[in-house]
């Protein structure tokens, strides 16, 4: 288990791929804190020693990119001890997070990227062996094959777990997702308005599979 072999583990991935749920389920023995909470962030920034007294290792810090100064404190802790599995960090802003990690925890952290559900997970197919070009492998895999009755439904829903846990309308889900993405992620990185960014997303989505042409996208956005 790489988590137990590393002093610090970072789990990154898009919002709503259930990073926190996975970590809480698999590592329930870890203490937990979340930097979505402003008071928690203030304490971590202004009184880091007290923060770690209140939140001892092993510790899971969610949305860690929201208070990047804590990474220097984590660096000191992991450098002073040979104990493994001290920290699990997670966050949704990959660019901002990786910048902080490269500056403070380079060579000290194992990085995992959690994607959305695969087709096997969506269809609850238990067969998960790595591909091997042999007849035995193909025969074994064939016993687990399932028919994809409505591939368009899968395309529209995408791979976010929430859309398969409950009967959630996918249009409502993605509308809320874009709004949250704008308010909580994009606006922290660049100054833009919601209409312009929505037009950008639409222009890029309409060109899926095409060669990237910045001029055409800029023309659509106006």
Task: Outline where the language-model segments fall.
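Short regulatory helix/loop adjacent to the ATP-binding pocket of P-loop NTPases
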Residues: 95-111, 123-128
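Hydrophobic anchor at the beta1->P-loop junction of P-loop NTPases
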Residues: 11
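Conserved catalytic/switch belt of AAA+ P-loop NTPases
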Residues: 71-95, 99-104
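Conserved lysine of the Walker
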Residues: 19-20
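Interdomain hinge/linker elements that couple catalytic modules in large macromolecular machines
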Residues: 124-222
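Short glycine-rich substrate-engagement loop in P-loop NTPases that contacts/grips substrate
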Residues: 30-58
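Pre-Walker A adenine-sensing motif
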Residues: 1-4
